[in-house]
Amino acid sequence: MQLFRDTEDTELFRTPKGDLHVVLVAGSNGWWNYRHQADVAHAYQLMRRNGVPEEKIIVMMFDDVACYPDNPYRGQLFNRPDGKDVYAGLKIDYYGSSVTPENFLNVLQGNAENVTGGNGRVVDSKPDDRIFVYFTDHGGYGLIAFPDDVLTVEDLNTALVDMHRRKRYDRFVFYMEACESGSMFQAVLNKDLKIYAVTAANALESSWGTYCDNDMNLPCLGDLFSVNWMQDTERHGINKETLQKQFKNVKALTNLSHVMHYGDLKLAREPISWFEGGNEKKMIAPMFSNADTYEEQHPKVSWPSRDIELMHLQKLMNTAKNAQVSKTLEQKIARIHEDRRIIEALFNSLVANLLANANDSAIEDLKCHNDVVKAFDSICIDLNKVIVFNYQDMTNINASLINS
C-alpha cells in the first residue's frame, strides 16, 4: 500500500483508486480578456507535463485571442512576461459559440446527449474517480460569466449535488478565478458532497489580473490567483505538497484579494498530485523553472479585473506617438466611462426606489437569486456589462430581494 504523509498533518492517506478527470474553462472572449485564455492554456500544459493523459482533459475556450488581429505574437499565448508559448499543442474541445453554461454543466455531469457543438466529449467518470475543475473569467454576486450568458450559483450547485447523488466521483476539487467567486460556494457548498473549492476572492470583492504592465504590448497576461497556484505547483512539485499547503502559499501571494476555501476542508490534506497530476513516472520537467529568481526579475504589476480594459487603453494613450491613435483611444476611454455612468445611474435608481435598506449578505434563497439574475439578463440589461462595470448594486438587489 502506497501512503502519503502530509507535512502539516500526521495522518496517513492511501493513494486513491480510479482516474483523474480535468476540466479547464476560460469563460470570456475578446482581446482585453487575454489573460483568461492564457491561464487555461498554461493550466493545460501544466496538467500534461504532470502526466495527465490528453484524453482525460477537457478544455472549453472561445479561442479568439491567439490569432486576434492585435496580437503581435500571432498564434501564441503567454502567461508570464518573456515566458514560453502556452498555446502550442493546446487541444480545445469546445470553442466559440459552444462555450456555454449549459455545455459546461453537461460536460461535468457526463450528459453527452445534451451537449451542442464542440467534439461532444464529456467527463466519463466513475464512483472511484477524482475530478479537478479550473474556471477563469469575470464574475458577480452568485454568478460567473460565459461569452454570451451567465451561470448562477443555483444552477452550479444543483449540478454538483446531482453528480454526488449519482456517484460520479469520489473526490472533487474546484479552483475558481472570478470576481466575487466566493459567493458561488459560501453558505451553499455542502461539505458532505466531498468537494473542496478554492476561490480567487471572497463573496464581495474583485479578483485581479497580473503581469499587466508588461513590455510585450499585450494586455494582462494572467490572473493573480491563477498565476500563483500554477507557479506554486511548478515551484514545489506535485508530490511534495498538499492542497492545504498550496492554499496557504497562494493565499499569502495573492495579496490584493482574499483567497478562500469552502466545502469538505478535509480534502485539503491530500497531495496536489491527486488532482493536478497523473502518473508520476510520466512527469517531465516543469514549463517554467527557477520561479523565485524569475519573480525578482519580473515583479507582478496587478490591476483590478474590471478596470483592465480601461487601464490598458490609458497606458496605450499615454505612450501613443500618433495624434490620431491617441484621439481614437481617448474616444474609447470616454465610451467606457459613459457606459459605466449609465449603468451606475440605473442601479442607483433601483436601489434608491426599491431597496433603500439594502445590506450585503450571503445568498440564502438560491431560486430567488437565480430568477432575479436571469430576469435582468433577459429583460433589462446585458449582465456581462454589469459584471464588468458595476457589481455592488446588483449584489444589494439580489441580497435584499432574497432576504426581504
Describe the function of each predicted region.
Residues 1-404:
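Cysteine endopeptidase catalytic domains of the caspase/legumain-like
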